[in-house]
């Protein structure tokens, strides 16, 4: 008699095995993508001007002849995952897809820095210590593996800090693409402060689109100290937990998900002070995820839940609408409005 688990049919068991193997080896998804970026393959295909044959690709890569078959295997797998298209005519060739177009260095929208930053062993390697982290009372995952909090680690490691800032800037460019169609966010404003605005990628887009709007990029002093502004763009260094420059509006893009509810309340209260000084009643605009497992498509939910686990390792979290609402009320805001922004991000406007 065939063995079974709890009376399961063999077909169910084998389906479960396939699911397990898919996730056991899922690291190859990330590492093969990292390989393509490190080998500059998207740019090679882009510069070729047409689908590139395997023989031309390995010639440009200058790989040993013994590894040509391995290059083909990796390209076949990446194509299966949607990063390249295989064209079969006289010789197997590879073309870019929308996904790999986002990895072409030098293009307006390039996420290659994000691939390099997140998949650097410094960051990705920390996830081998999830078990140890779970039993530590107060430490974040990176506190366990790096010996300090993530932000302290960035301050002490300029090279990785640059990589992180480049990654955040590359991601901001995609968000900015969506913001161009959100004129209503900036209507009637004379000033806005981008809290945690990094090197100013988002603020520059806002300034170009709304030249009469005064933009302030507010970030840690070491991030902005060597940056120069323009007519309607200025950089200010400081601590968002202490005070935030006054403005008609505050922008928090990918900020609150980094922090605990307690810390978010501190930030939101400082934001409220910044937009209500001098009798004004401005607003706070948040760009972040809103988890909705009932309404979202499965793939969107998976991304949001994946990011929630990722943020948990920083002591942050992704939130559903009820969790957001609770924060806003406790911080003293009266009402809010949520609008879809991109495939998995929302634009939240809150008013004191």
Swiss-Prot record:
Binding site for substrate: 118-127
Biological process, per Gene Ontology: methylation
Function noted in UniProt: Transfers a methyl group to 7-hydroxyls of the isoflavones daidzein, genistein and 6,7,4'-trihydroxyisoflavone. Can also methylate (+)6a-hydroxymaackiain with lower efficiency.
Keyword Transferase found: yes
Family in the record: Belongs to the class I-like SAM-binding methyltransferase superfamily. Cation-independent O-methyltransferase family. COMT subfamily.
Enzyme Commission identifier(s): 2.1.1.150
Quaternary assembly: Homodimer.
Catalytic activity: a 7-hydroxyisoflavone + S-adenosyl-L-methionine = a 7-methoxyisoflavone + S-adenosyl-L-homocysteine + H(+)
GO terms assigned for molecular function: isoflavone 7-O-methyltransferase activity; protein dimerization activity
Source organism per UniProt: Medicago sativa (Alfalfa)
Keyword Transport: no
The protein's annotated pathway: Phytoalexin biosynthesis; medicarpin biosynthesis
Protein name: Isoflavone-7-O-methyltransferase 6
Amino-acid positions noted as binding S-adenosyl-L-methionine in the UniProt annotation, renumbered to this chain: 196, 219, 239-240, 253
InterPro entries registered for this protein in UniProt: COMT-like (IPR016461), O_MeTrfase_dom (IPR001077), Plant_O-MeTrfase_dimerisation (IPR012967), SAM-dependent_MTases_sf (IPR029063), WH-like_DNA-bd_sf (IPR036388), WH_DNA-bd_sf (IPR036390)
Positions annotated as active site in the UniProt record: 257 (proton acceptor)
Keywords: Methyltransferase, S-adenosyl-L-methionine, Transferase
């Amino acid at each position: 008699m065939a063995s079974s688990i709890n009376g399961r049919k063999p077909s169910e068991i084998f389906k479960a095995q396939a699911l397990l193997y898919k996730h056991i080896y899922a690291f190859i998804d990330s590492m093969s993508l990292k390989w393509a970026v490190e080998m500059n393959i998207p740019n090679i295909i882009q510069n070729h001007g047409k689908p590139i044959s395997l023989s031309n690709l390995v010639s440009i890569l200058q790989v040993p002849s013994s590894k040509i078959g391995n290059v083909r295997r990796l390209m076949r797998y990446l194509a299966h995952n949607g990063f390249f298209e295989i064209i079969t005519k006289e010789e197997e060739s590879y073309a870019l897809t929308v996904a790999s177009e986002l990895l072409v260095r030098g293009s307006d929208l390039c996420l290659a820095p994000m691939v390099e930053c997140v998949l650097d062993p410094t960051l990705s390697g920390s996830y081998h210590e999830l078990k140890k982290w779970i039993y530590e009372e107060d430490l974040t995952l990176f506190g366990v593996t790096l010996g300090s909090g993530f932000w302290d680690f960035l301050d002490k490691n300029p090279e990785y800090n640059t990589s992180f800032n480049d990654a955040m800037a590359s991601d901001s460019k995609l968000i900015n693409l969506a913001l161009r169609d959100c004129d209503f966010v900036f209507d009637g404003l004379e000033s806005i402060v981008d809290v945690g605005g990094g090197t100013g990628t988002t603020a520059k887009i806002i300034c170009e689109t709304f030249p009469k709007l005064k933009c302030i990029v507010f970030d840690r002093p070491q991030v902005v100290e060597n940056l120069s502004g323009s007519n309607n763009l200025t950089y200010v260094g400081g601590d968002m937990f202490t005070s935030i420059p006054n403005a008609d509006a505050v922008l928090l893009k990918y900020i609150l998900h980094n922090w605990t509810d307690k810390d978010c309340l501190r930030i939101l209260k400082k934001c409220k002070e910044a937009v209500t000084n001098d009798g004004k009643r401005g607003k706070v605009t948040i760009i972040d995820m809103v988890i909705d497992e009932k309404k979202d498509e499965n793939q969107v939910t998976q991304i949001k839940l994946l990011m929630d686990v990722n943020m948990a390792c920083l002591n942050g979290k992704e939130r559903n609408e009820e969790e957001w609402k609770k924060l806003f009320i406790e911080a003293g805001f009266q009402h809010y409005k949520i609008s879809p922004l991109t495939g998995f991000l929302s634009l939240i406007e809150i008013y004191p």
